[in-house]
Swiss-Prot record:
PANTHER family: 60S RIBOSOMAL PROTEIN L35/50S RIBOSOMAL PROTEIN L29, LARGE RIBOSOMAL SUBUNIT PROTEIN UL29C. One of its GO terms (biological process) is translation. GO terms for molecular function: structural constituent of ribosome. SUPFAM superfamilies: Ribosomal protein L29 (L29p). Belongs to the universal ribosomal protein uL29 family. InterPro entries: Ribosomal_protein_uL29, Ribosomal_uL29, Ribosomal_uL29_CS, Ribosomal_uL29_sf. Signal peptide: none annotated. Keywords: Ribonucleoprotein, Ribosomal protein. This is Large ribosomal subunit protein uL29. The keyword Ribosomal protein applies. One of its GO terms (cellular component) is cytosolic large ribosomal subunit.
């Protein structure tokens, strides 16, 4: 997910996306531990998406204050 797309989402949508990505990250780590994960690059993609969302959430919070 690109930063531009993330910025267009509302705060509630961002929180929902963050939760969704965290669940996906959990499942990917579980697959990696059991040796079933084929696309290991997806782990870093999901982690970076979570970081992008958290960054934009904190920016929005600072704008409000």
């Amino acid at each position: 997910m690109k930063t531009k797309e993330i910025r267009s989402l509302s705060t509630d949508e961002l929180l929902a996306k963050e939760k969704q990505y965290k669940e996906e990250l959990f499942n990917l780590r579980f697959q990696q531990a059991t040796g079933q994960l084929e696309n290991t690059a997806r782990l870093s993609q999901v982690r970076k998406n979570i970081a992008r969302i958290k960054t934009i959430l904190s920016e929005k919070e600072l704008e409000q204050n």
